[in-house]
Amino acid sequence: PYPPYVIDSAHGKGYVTDMVLLIFKKAGLEAEYKNVPFKRALAEIERGNFTGLLALSPGREKYLFTENSMGYFKNQFFVRADSTWKWDGRSSLEKVVFGGILGYRFDKEFIDPHVEKFKGDPERVQLIAGQDALQRNIVKMTMGRIDVIFDDSLAIAYAAKEAGVKEKIR
């Protein structure tokens, strides 16, 4: 899940999921949405069990099943509200513990190389997986276990609100 885009709740499945299912229905096609962790979704696509993903990051275009985008993410850095850290190029990542989600691609030029280089060093990079990975990373950040995360601003706002820590991050 990647709320508010993709979610599985009593209130709906997220606006991207609802839109895609409606498009398929209007085209007379049957479609099913399965809510699984991102890394598993990638593996199921590679095995031929899933047809596509609803939310993609750069470098994952081969999983796209439409020619047109239906929306865009606005990725940015987030820190604790009391943090003085600011992005000032690649070297600024050297001073913090970066938290991310296993299987995600962030940014080919700066973040991905940093994650690849330090993914085995929990003092530099901590990657987690699971249905609530984004919310857990936000909570880890508010507790001081990681210093910075990089993700979509709407997804962060939603997850932080759900975790009750929206005022503790910026």
Residue ranges and their predicted role:
Residues 1-7, 90-108:
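Short loop->beta-strand "edge-of-pocket" segments that line small-molecule binding or catalytic clefts
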Residues 40, 46, 55-64, 147-170:
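A ligand-binding cleft/hinge motif common to bilobed small-molecule-binding domains
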Residues 20-29, 68-70, 103-131, 138, ...:
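Ligand-binding cleft/hinge of the Venus flytrap
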Residues 1-2, 57-59, 80-83, 101-104, ...:
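Solvent-exposed coil/turn segments that connect beta secondary-structure elements
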Residues 65-78, 91-94, 170:
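Short Pro/Gly-enriched coil loops immediately N-terminal to beta-strands
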